Amino acid sequence: MNSLKVARVVLRAVRPAPALRRGYADVAPDKLRLTLALPHQAMYKSQDVVQVNIPAESGEMGILAQHVPSIEQLKPGLVEIIEEAGGNKQFFLSGGFATVQPGSVLSINAVEGYPLEDFSAENVRNQISEAQKIASGSGSEQDKAEANIELEVLESLQAALK
């Protein structure tokens, strides 16, 4: 066999190298996808927002897109949601949990939550004085403990209304 025939046979036997194509990483989301759920309703259901400020037990937190994944216990306080259109909404939550998941997903679960504008500063002051009377009164230990918890929530609400 001459060398030309050998070269042809060898070339046919060799598999061509795969064509390499450039791959691109997925685009990182620039919005935060928020779900704010209560037992009886979803106030936000997978809606894109710019930022959410929460009252975590570890301190006040501002959460943006690409936040590190975490789980935070919420204390009673104001949750502020900055929406894409530039407006913001404020809700008072009695407590709960916030979970930041990979992919800029934030889930907030709370037992009670209401828009801040639903509250009257005068009514809150009246309820605080009633709870203080019970907490410092001669009632049972359980009544005093419940009044102290109520005071904590009402004082947080009063601070949010200012």
Q: Could you tell me what each predicted segment is?
A:
Residues 19-24, 41, 157-158:
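Short N-terminal helix-initiation segments at or just after the protein's N-terminus
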Residues 1-29:
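N-terminal mitochondrial targeting presequence
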Residues 35-126, 130:
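Compact, glycine-rich, soluble single-domain proteins
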Residues 25-39:
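Acidic, gly/proline-rich low-complexity N-terminal segments at the extreme N terminus
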Residues 114-162:
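Acidic/glycine-rich phosphate/pyrophosphate-binding loops and surrounding catalytic core
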Residues 25, 61-64, 141:
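Compositionally biased, intrinsically disordered low-complexity regions
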